[in-house]
């Protein structure tokens, strides 16, 4: 039986110990974690294979299985991400600002750890390492609750982390996992406000809503990516095709994949046949409005009429919505209606229209002439991310180290009293 109150107490105690560590001590523990991830590859992959087999037996989609899958290459990449976190500046103890008041009181606003982070996620074993490494770097303890699909993978990964912490002389309970698949434990975790300071869900809309609606702990909402690319009439069409191919097909199971392509009406008949030919080898399936449907059917593309609900879909597959718009105003209006405030891009040669798009589109990341696939902590130079926040309070976009800190005012006087 999982005792969450005991886990919370242990995490709170570990968080205090972590908050007192030097940057060197934390980095040493992270280095040991990276080493053990590589040294224990065979064991980790064997446990992950159990999860993959169960996923296939249970009929899970290929997009979910891709998220669940660990390979030697992916494990090496995860270990490298941990080492990259080591190389990042530690925000804890950083003086944000300050000054001296007329009373002589000296003020400094200093970054401090949040305390204990609760992370709830689905079929993403890499999140176990990503979140743990960022939390440890910032002096936070973490309680991890992965989906039942990752049960074996998470258990071995947390074991690797705890062994590294023990070797480094740090509290093992700084990183804990709820491995019991009982969903009632999620609700219990969401009410563990005596011990947990922040909840970060990573998963679909259902998980986000569950946490937002039921938690007594502050929740960071995000990760749902209904991302758009608008191809404006002045865009370099050949270079635009390369960006769209990257944004849709590089790894479609990620939240920064483009799901809807907006094409300006004046170039649609010229551009869409090129798009169909470009993406044919990738087996992309189009869902198009009436105008785009007619054009794509004319070149024998794999296309169906798009529905209202599909315009709100986070496909996470090789499906792509295509909508024709008259111009930038209609493109922005469409994004405002259907976007999830994650990542939005314009392809254009007009600096004026690029500036207008950036000013009018409300999203965590807005791109000009670039793929939406860059919305990622590693790509942004933040190290592995704990989440991509699509809300506006506390953190927005890829959440790196600073997003896992708060601050306190340090006030130093000379036996100073208020007048």
Curated annotation (Swiss-Prot):
Pathway as given in its UniProt record: Amino-acid biosynthesis; L-proline biosynthesis; L-glutamate 5-semialdehyde from L-glutamate: step 2/2
Catalytic activity, as annotated: L-glutamate 5-semialdehyde + phosphate + NADP(+) = L-glutamyl 5-phosphate + NADPH + H(+)
HAMAP family with a match to the protein in the record: ProA
Signal peptide: none
Organism: Mannheimia succiniciproducens (strain KCTC 0769BP / MBEL55E)
UniProt GO BP: L-proline biosynthetic process
Subcellular location: Cytoplasm
Function, as annotated: Catalyzes the NADPH-dependent reduction of L-glutamate 5-phosphate into L-glutamate 5-semialdehyde and phosphate. The product spontaneously undergoes cyclization to form 1-pyrroline-5-carboxylate.
Database matches in InterPro entries: Ald_DH/histidinol_DH, Ald_DH_C, Ald_DH_N, Aldehyde_DH_dom, G-glutamylP_reductase_CS, Glu-5-SA_DH, GPR_dom
Pfam family, one: Aldedh
The keyword NADP belongs to this UniProt entry's keyword annotation: yes
Enzyme Commission number(s): 1.2.1.41
UniProt keyword annotation of Endoplasmic reticulum present: no
NCBIfam families: PRK00197.1, proA
GO terms, molecular function: glutamate-5-semialdehyde dehydrogenase activity; NADP binding
Disulfide linkage: none
GO CC terms of this entry: cytoplasm
Recorded family membership: Belongs to the gamma-glutamyl phosphate reductase family.
Main location: cytoplasm
Keywords: Amino-acid biosynthesis, Cytoplasm, NADP, Oxidoreductase, Proline biosynthesis
PANTHER family the UniProt entry points to: DELTA-1-PYRROLINE-5-CARBOXYLATE SYNTHASE (PTHR11063:SF8), GLUTAMATE SEMIALDEHYDE DEHYDROGENASE (PTHR11063)
Top-tier EC class: oxidoreductase
Protein name: Gamma-glutamyl phosphate reductase
